[in-house]
């Protein structure tokens, strides 16, 4: 299993992430078995690209400095042919986020793109509301994720109640998980960083992303079960989730299925 190899190799993941979730992302990567590196210092991007196994970019707390740093990092990781995962946080909400996401994608070098249905849909011109799709030309997340993968030549990862991953040809769905993931800050940010850690192992990218989604959902299910057993809620779930990521994860609640 990919998780076993991850814990043996402990890939170094460079994160340019938002400051709201930075600590949670670092702790989550450590729990999973990877090694986090958190830096947005533009002048050290070239040096960090040489020693890191993968790069995760999250535009959650976007500003001019973060944009310049992301561009500089992509340039050096691309030159070394190392995996880059982009999380276009909120790109369906503002022109700045949308345009920045497109600019980073068009610079080349992005290996995987992780977001929710609204974010990914906006990158291929499909309007998708949080309560469901309202587009006339695509009526399922399957169509959105396939288009994203094809248009930007990436592994597309859509997370939500059901996760979907695609390489532009095949589409896999991953069910299971916990509703509590939507009630804590940073769950998506950590998922993006975890994607980078798995891609850093240089295994089959589509299979790796599907396995990660399944493991992530199973860990959240395990954490919810533990929290409820102890009369807990959001707060205890967060801590049990980190615990669950660090323990052996047996897929019982999560199911990977080929849908296209």
From Swiss-Prot:
Name listed for the protein in its UniProt record: Hydroxyethylthiazole kinase
Binding site for ATP: 114, 159
InterPro entries (UniProt xref): Hyethyz_kinase, Ribokinase-like
One GO MF term: hydroxyethylthiazole kinase activity
GO BP term, example: thiamine diphosphate biosynthetic process
Disulfide partners: none
Enzyme Commission number(s): 2.7.1.50
Cofactors demanded by this protein: Mg(2+)
Catalytic activity: 5-(2-hydroxyethyl)-4-methylthiazole + ATP = 4-methyl-5-(2-phosphooxyethyl)-thiazole + ADP + H(+)
Organism: Helicobacter pylori (strain HPAG1)
Pathway given in the UniProt record: Cofactor biosynthesis; thiamine diphosphate biosynthesis; 4-methyl-5-(2-phosphoethyl)-thiazole from 5-(2-hydroxyethyl)-4-methylthiazole: step 1/1
One Pfam family linked to the record: HK
Main EC class the enzyme belongs to: transferase
Protein function: Catalyzes the phosphorylation of the hydroxyl group of 4-methyl-5-beta-hydroxyethylthiazole (THZ).
Chain residues that bind substrate: 38, 186
Keywords from the UniProt entry: ATP-binding, Kinase, Magnesium, Metal-binding, Nucleotide-binding, Thiamine biosynthesis, Transferase
Protein family according to the UniProt entry: Belongs to the Thz kinase family.
NCBIfam families registered for this protein in UniProt: PRK09355.1, thiM
